[in-house]
Curated annotation (Swiss-Prot):
The modification 4-hydroxyproline is found at P8, P9, P10, P11, P12, P17, P18, P19, P20, P26, P27, P28, P29. Its main location: secreted. The keyword Lyase does not apply. Keywords: Cell wall, Glycoprotein, Hydroxylation, Secreted. One of its GO terms (cellular component) is extracellular region. This is 136 kDa hydroxyproline-rich cell wall glycoprotein, major component. It is found in: Secreted, Cell wall. It comes from the Eukaryota. It comes from Phaseolus vulgaris (Kidney bean).
Amino acid sequence: NHYSYSSPPPPPVVSSPPPPYYYYSPPPPV
């Protein structure tokens, strides 16, 4: 077991939801 219990667990990978327009329109140009 090489788990580092001394260190806090990594935060869950939960990216912010995309903007509403993303669902019906292409992303804005960069």
